[in-house]
Amino acid sequence: VLYHSIYPAENNSKKWICFVHGAGGNSSIWFNQVRFFKTYFNVLLIDLRGHGKSEVSPEGTEYTFNIIIDDILNVLDENKIKKSHFVGISLGSILIQKMLQNHSNRVEKIGLGGAILNLNPQSRFLMLMGKLTQSILPFIWIYTFFAYVIMPYKAHRKSRALFIKEAKKISHNEFKRWYRLTATILPVLKRIRDKEMRTPILYIMGSHDYMFLPFVKKIVALHRSSSLITVANSGHVVNIDQPEEFNSQLLSFLLSD
C-alpha cells in the first residue's frame, strides 16, 4: 500500500477528502490545505509510487494509468473509505478523472487545479524534447527546464522552487518510468474530454496557466457538471500560488448542494 497520511476531521465529520499530487511532487505540496480542510473533513494525503515516502517499484516495472489508480483505490480500501471527495493538481487531475470513469461509485465531488485536459503544441514539443534527452541529461535538468516553461513568472517562484526541490528526491529510473507513462496520455485525455460524467467537477485554474487553461475553458462550456474559477496572479500550481483563494473556493464548492 502507498505511503499515506490521515488527519481526522476536527468536527467529527464522516466525510473524506483525498489529495493527489502531480508528477515529481509529493503530499507535502498540500501543506496549505491540510490545516484548513481538516476542520471540515477527514483528510487523506497520498504519495504516488516512487514519490515522497512511498516505495520505489522493482526494476523492470512499467506503469499504466490503471495500475496507479489501483494504488489509490487500495489506500481507500485499506482505510475502509467507501467514497471521498478528490482534489488533484497537474498529473493528479488526470488520475482522478480517469478513476472517475472507471470507479465513479468511489467519488463524491472533484476539485482540480492545474488541470490537464489536452496538450498544446508547446507542451507536445516539451514532451518530445524530454523523450529525446532523458537518456543523455540528468532528469533534474529536464524537470527544471519544464518547471520554468510551465511556471515562468515571478509570482510562480515559490511553487516552482518547491517542485524542483521535491523532484530531486526521485530516482532517475523512477523519473523515466513516469515519463514513459505520459507517452500514453493523449488517448486518456481524449476519453476524458469526450465522456462527460455527472459527478460535479470544479476546475480552479491560475490565470497564468497558459498551457492548460484554454482547454479547461472549452470543456466547461460543453460539460454541464463542470465549472471553472480562474484565480488571478496564479500559475499552474494554484494551491501554492494562491492558497487562501484556492481553499475558500474549493470549500464552498464541496459544501454546496
Name what the model sees in each region.
Residues V1-C18, T39-F41, D77, I81-K82, ...:
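Alpha/beta-hydrolase fold catalytic core
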Residues S5-V56:
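Conserved HGGG/HGGXW glycine-rich cap/lid loop of the alpha/beta-hydrolase fold
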Residues R35, L44-V87, L91, S248:
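Active-site loop/oxyanion-hole signature of alpha/beta-hydrolase fold enzymes
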Residues Q97, Q101-N102, V107-L137:
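Flexible "cap/lid" loop of the alpha/beta hydrolase fold
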Residues P121-S123, I140-K195:
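Conserved alpha/beta-hydrolase catalytic His-Asp/Glu region
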Residues M197, Y203-M205:
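Short beta-strand/loop motif that positions the catalytic acidic residue
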Residues Y210-V216:
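Conserved alpha/beta-hydrolase "acid-adjacent" motif
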Residues S234-N247:
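Catalytic histidine-centered segment of alpha/beta-hydrolase-like enzymes
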